[in-house]
């Protein structure tokens, strides 16, 4: 621990597993107090029992719940938006319901949390917002990621807009664009692809391995810390060379 986030208060969505959880753990190790949320409350228990974070169930698609949670938590210095869903398919496999759900969870959830927490961040003199986007859709089109890619491109645009609107008021807003990261949800998709599914994902990687959630969390710590004080409105690519 180097206490790069000492004295800072952070709020993390989708913290029960994968990238969100890794970020919550990394923030705590760097000295931040962490309020971790997820729709799966049971999966948050170890974060609380290990003294890593205060936890609460939160459906990031529920505006009233987001607002109530923000009121309960109060002012934060760091907002990490990690909630998201990967829809598999082309435009022909994407129903109106699929489209609406993907945008609601992947984009509008960030709109909700930013609207809920930004006023107190402004009152407190500033803060850092970090949104999890993706290499897919922002830097490169990926097969069968039609609506997923569209939502992540929207996240990058949302990020730049927030950064531009509040740059003179102490708010920094950046997004992280991971490549293929080994998380529980990614392993579920690999299993659904059948035997050799994980190996198929690995074969697409120039570095011949998958990324780790901890590698994404390390970048999130940097963006949350004062070390990145001159950085805002940027989509940070961390993909093991996938887009080369």
Label for each model-derived stretch:
Residues 90-91, 95-103, 197, 201:
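Substrate-binding pocket helix/loop in short-chain dehydrogenase/reductase
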Residues 178-188, 225:
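Short, flexible catalytic-loop segment of classical short-chain dehydrogenase/reductase
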Residues 111, 209-238, 243:
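C-terminal substrate-recognition "lid" of short-chain dehydrogenase/reductases
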Residues 114, 151, 159:
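Active-site helix of classical SDR
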Residues 134:
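Residue(s) in the substrate-gating loop at a strand-loop-helix junction
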Residues 119, 164-168, 229:
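Alpha-helical segment proximal to the catalytic Tyr-Lys
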Residues 94, 140-149, 161, 189:
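Active-site loop-to-helix junction immediately N-terminal to the catalytic Tyr of the SDR YXXXK motif
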